[in-house]
Amino acid sequence: MPNNSTALSLANVTYITMEIFIGLCAIVGNVLVICVVKLNPSLQTTTFYFIVSLALADIAVGVLVMPLAIVVSLGITIHFYSCLFMTCLLLIFTHASIMSLLAIAVDRYLRVKLTVRYKRVTTHRRIWLALGLCWLVSFLVGLTPMFGWNMKLTSEYHRNVTFLSCQFVSVMRMDYMVYFSFLTWIFIPLVVMCAIYLDIFYIIRNKLSLNLSNSKETGAFYGREFKTAKSLFLVLFLFALSWLPLSIINCIIYFNGEVPQLVLYMGILLSHANSMMNPIVYAYKIKKFKETYLLILKACVVCHPSDSLDTSIEKNSE
């Protein structure tokens, strides 16, 4: 028994250390993303407003979700609904990310499909409405267990329990996780987004091959759109790669399969690590992001005044 307890303790320490590292990287990286969009006027477009929404969800993962995941992993004894609320927070920001990614995909589709009418369609009012809808859906889906779809109201064992050792599976129903959270609000949107990006690439390829106007400007426009779409599809691919393993683990648990603790920890860490991946993708794939990153970092290192930083970024964005 002591050996098992020591092994579990070592596993928890390693897990918590990794969560703290991922959380710090996610916070710093995504705060930098928001600063880049705020400082660079050329990045203040519809797509990048949705990217800021995605960054806010990732910051929330770092600030709120990861510490809560650590509390859950330690199995601290707390009130049932306090534990349930914490686990719901783990889900809200996941769905905020997927909804932001869906909004980005739809925006890029409108950009290449309605090239002439795009600016008339994507008004500021509609952008804010879309952002509000993304977060509203995320809160409704994530908080659904608080309204009854949980172990308290559906399990004989937990019905009379007020305080318990806080564990994800002790409060959260796996049928909710598998059928509602994963299949309905993660898997289906992922399939829809893949279809949207395939159509985007198809439209761009046709426009570039036909090039009916024989205009260099048109060719350059669709060339830029192709590069941007590839970068954003990579963000989507990394999200799927990060979250699908944990979703598969939840499916295995739901169908009474055995999942080793180490595998579960790795699935959780991989899903949380997605929050620190996007700033790296932007830096490598989007030139204006990379240039603004470097200007901000240079200003921080050599202590440039903010006015000179703004001037440098304005010149860079022209």
Curated annotation (Swiss-Prot):
GO CC, any one term: dendrite
Membrane topology: Multi-pass membrane protein
Organs and tissues of expression: Expressed in the lung and bone. Expressed at lower levels in osteosarcoma tissues (at protein level).
UniProt keyword Disulfide bond present: yes
Organism whose genome encodes this protein: Homo sapiens
PROSITE patterns xrefs: G_PROTEIN_RECEP_F1_1, G_PROTEIN_RECEP_F1_2
Protein name, entry field: Adenosine receptor A3
A molecular function GO annotation: G protein-coupled adenosine receptor activity
